[in-house]
Amino acid sequence: MASVYENSYMIVLIFLLLGILLPVVALTLGKMLRPNKPSAAKATTYESGIEPFHDANIRFHARYYIFALLFVIFDVETLFLYPWAVAYDKLGLFALIEMLIFVVMLLVGLAYAWKKKVLQWL
């Protein structure tokens, strides 16, 4: 008989397998069952019903990369701050100091990026 510890891992393993298997099966069945009728109209770029007048493949400037990277960093910060805020009363002063250090480190990085004029658009 499996212990509670092993049973917990079994449940996680089942969810992991289902999470991988169900999308793969659904996509495979969709690919096998759909009609395959390629045409030039289906291959064109969709522009709200208007006939496309140039190629849709454009190059983005490298500045977009920096903004995307900063967004991801502060988005991950939110992911770390939310559980801390929910359990704040149970964590105590040490967790508050740890979170303040974490936020200050991110703010120092933001100030550095601002000082280096990384955030200026033009």
UniProtKB/Swiss-Prot annotation:
Cellular location(s): Cell membrane
One Gene Ontology cellular component annotation held by this UniProt entry: NADH dehydrogenase complex
Lipid bilayer topology: Multi-pass membrane protein
Transmembrane segments: 10-30, 66-86, 91-111
Top-level enzyme category: translocase
EC id: 7.1.1.-
Subunit comment: NDH-1 is composed of 14 different subunits. Subunits NuoA, H, J, K, L, M, N constitute the membrane sector of the complex.
Protein name stated in the entry: NADH-quinone oxidoreductase subunit A
Protein source organism: Bacillus mycoides (strain KBAB4)
Lineage: Bacteria, Bacillati, Bacillota, Bacilli, Bacillales
Originating gene: nuoA
